[in-house]
Amino acid sequence: MKRSASDSPLLFDIPLAPDFSEEKRLLARGLKHIVGIDEAGRGPLAGPVVAAAVVLDIDNLPNGLDDSKRLTAVKREALYETILEKAITVSVASLSARSIDASDIRKAALEAMRRASVGLTLQPCHALIDGRDVPPGLPCPGSALVKGDQRSVSIAAASIVAKVTRDRMMIRAGAAHPPYGLEIHAGYATVKHRAAIETTGPVPGIHRYTFAPIKGRYSV
């Protein structure tokens, strides 16, 4: 069963859970290795943007794949381990808060996705990317899929790997910078996080100085 376009502002159907339809269309054209690419961390005030690229084994797909945002942390962690075990190849890349400030978040996210794709241990035949943009410099042709993490199991797997990787990074950042609670909110603009910035100020290398409410009020 699928949600219809009437349930969505988008002009296509979205399955209740990601499936292998997009990959099957490419496989039918003789394209063997399909890589799913997604990122985590576009919106937070702190921390890196992390991208993952995953080539799944069509004969050994993990069960329960879904958009990482629709899964509990416990389920994401379990699926993360399963993906690493069952996937043909997985690659992760990140760009720091400083790199984001030096460019912009859109360009940084696309660059992280490109770096993840070129880090794979095999040459993919086609990339499925979550969102509206195909990152420049991919090692293969690519297709951008709006809501791709809800449509494609390959992108869903990448979303889980990116999210878990970034959450673990933010847990370590939280231990190093206790006042901000980074391990709890992963750098998003919660009330506690904003209050800590007001009291203590942002941390160079951790916070994004080009993001409101930091932008224009603090300098590195």
Swiss-Prot record:
Q: Its GO CC terms?
A: cytoplasm; ribonuclease H2 complex
Its subcellular locations are: Cytoplasm
What reaction(s) does this enzyme catalyze?
Answer: Endonucleolytic cleavage to 5'-phosphomonoester
Its BP terms in the Gene Ontology are: DNA replication, removal of RNA primer; mismatch repair
Q: Which PROSITE patterns match?
A: RNASE_H_2
* UniProt keywords, alphabetically: Cytoplasm, Endonuclease, Hydrolase, Manganese, Metal-binding, Nuclease
Specify the domain of life of the species encoding this protein.
Answer: Bacteria
Cofactor, how bound (note):
Manganese or magnesium. Binds 1 divalent metal ion per monomer in the absence of substrate. May bind a second metal ion after substrate binding.
Gene3D superfamilies given for it?
Answer: Ribonuclease H-like superfamily/Ribonuclease H (3.30.420.10)
Pfam families in the record: RNase_HII
Instruction: Quote one Gene Ontology molecular function term.
Output: RNA binding
Residue positions binding a divalent metal cation: D38, E39, D130
Q: Which cofactor does it need?
A: Mn(2+); Mg(2+)
Q: Where is the RNase H type-2 domain?
A: 32-220
Specify where it is mainly localized. Answer: cytoplasm
Would I find Magnesium among this entry's keywords? no
Give the EC number(s) under which this enzyme is classified: 3.1.26.4
The record's comment on protein family reads: Belongs to the RNase HII family.
Q: Which PANTHER family match?
A: RIBONUCLEASE H2 SUBUNIT A, RIBONUCLEASE HII
Cited function: Endonuclease that specifically degrades the RNA of RNA-DNA hybrids.
Could you identify this protein by its name?
Ribonuclease HII
Lineage of source species: Bacteria, Pseudomonadati, Pseudomonadota, Alphaproteobacteria, Hyphomicrobiales
